[in-house]
């Protein structure tokens, strides 16, 4: 387990900024809590308290499976891909949000896109192709995706047109359990 390089840090924060904007600073500077850090272990970026990172330094690399919250994976090309396990933090700090009606929740949780008929609410001034957090109408985070249309376009579009492209959802915990660890 090692700290992220400058290039890895830049890629991670660029990717996170697409979802949570300037709120990325809140991940490291949490008020009333201890300092948190990002660490790389086996091409996975983990988010944890600094105290936990220091304790993990005593464990050998082969014996350590994971520690903290899995935030992202680094692909073979060096790109960073945000994982659904980071949903709690993305949902908390997200600038743009979409709420899905109960009749479309199941479809989204099985990896489908959301049409206009399933759109409950959308944050004002959401631009087209903006990364968004997806919630149920009861404010339960379901996943994240990309807004297929802006807020104004959503109000004027046909009922069967796509308004949200699926990226990740909490159903992945069950579908891809082996890949998550």
Indicate residue ranges for each PLM-predicted region:
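Accessory RNA 3′-end/elbow-binding domains used by RNA modification enzymes
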Residues: 1-181
């Amino acid at each position: 387990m090692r700290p992220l390089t400058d290039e890895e840090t830049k890629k991670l924060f660029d990717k996170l900024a697409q979802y949570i904007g300037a709120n990325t600073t809140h991940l490291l500077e949490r008020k009333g809590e201890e300092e948190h850090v990002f660490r790389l272990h086996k091409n996975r970026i983990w988010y944890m308290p600094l105290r936990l990172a220091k304790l993990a330094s005593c464990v050998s690399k082969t014996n350590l499976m994971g520690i903290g919250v899995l935030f992202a994976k680094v692909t073979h090309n060096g790109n960073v891909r945000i994982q659904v396990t980071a949903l709690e933090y993305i949902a908390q700090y997200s600038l743009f949000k979409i709420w899905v009606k109960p009749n479309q929740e199941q479809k989204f949780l099985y990896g489908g896109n959301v049409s206009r008929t399933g759109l409950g609410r959308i944050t004002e001034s959401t631009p087209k192709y903006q990364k968004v957090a997806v919630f149920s109408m009861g404010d339960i985070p379901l996943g994240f995706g990309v807004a297929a249309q802006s807020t104004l376009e959503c109000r004027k579009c046909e009922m069967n047109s796509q308004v949200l492209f699926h990226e990740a959802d909490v159903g992945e915990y069950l579908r891809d359990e082996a890949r998550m660890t």
